[in-house]
């Protein structure tokens, strides 16, 4: 009695498949006979892309076939979203994290090395060039803090 409305909406060929859906063995047998009708309804039910699948889904909810459809659609859809986000997230995270340390570490040693190498030459040059002048000695000691200035002065002269 309840299957009356669905039968009216669909052609008379639908009643046999509807009764065959509950049974697993009858399902394969009607497939060869009605390959197109039987094959097309199951996919639309799984994928709510077509509006016609909704009425059919309600009719199939009464049968034992609907549970299978959600189960089939759930496994593929569930694993795909989780797998997709994790891959991109870890990939950029490690690549960006090592880059920042490398960038921060690289300039520090370079600048420290250059600063360390700069002070000795200027101090050695200034010492012999003006050994008698005492004011230059204190000034040279203060210059190492700003090695760039002390180095530029002797190189220009």
From Swiss-Prot:
Residues 96-117, 124-157 have a biased composition (Low complexity). Residues 1-157 are annotated as: Disordered. Residues 62-71 have a biased composition (Basic residues). Residues 8-31, 76-95 have a biased composition (Pro residues). This is Uncharacterized protein ORF4. It comes from Grapevine fleck virus (isolate Italy/MT48).
């Amino acid at each position: 009695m309840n299957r009356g409305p669905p039968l009216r909406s669909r052609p008379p060929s639908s009643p046999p498949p509807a009764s065959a859906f509950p049974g697993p063995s009858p399902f394969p047998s009607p497939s060869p006979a009605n390959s197109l009708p039987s094959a097309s309804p199951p996919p639309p039910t799984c994928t709510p892309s077509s509006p016609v699948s909704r009425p059919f889904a309600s009719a199939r909810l009464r049968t034992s076939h609907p549970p299978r459809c959600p189960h089939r659609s759930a496994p593929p859809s569930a694993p795909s979203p989780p797998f997709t986000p994790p891959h991109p997230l870890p990939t950029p995270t490690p690549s960006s994290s090592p880059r920042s340390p490398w960038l921060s570490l690289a300039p520090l040693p370079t600048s420290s090395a250059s600063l360390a190498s700069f002070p000795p030459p200027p101090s050695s040059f200034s010492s012999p060039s003006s050994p008698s002048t005492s004011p230059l000695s204190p000034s040279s000691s203060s210059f190492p803090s700003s090695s760039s200035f002390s180095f530029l002065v002797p190189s220009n002269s």
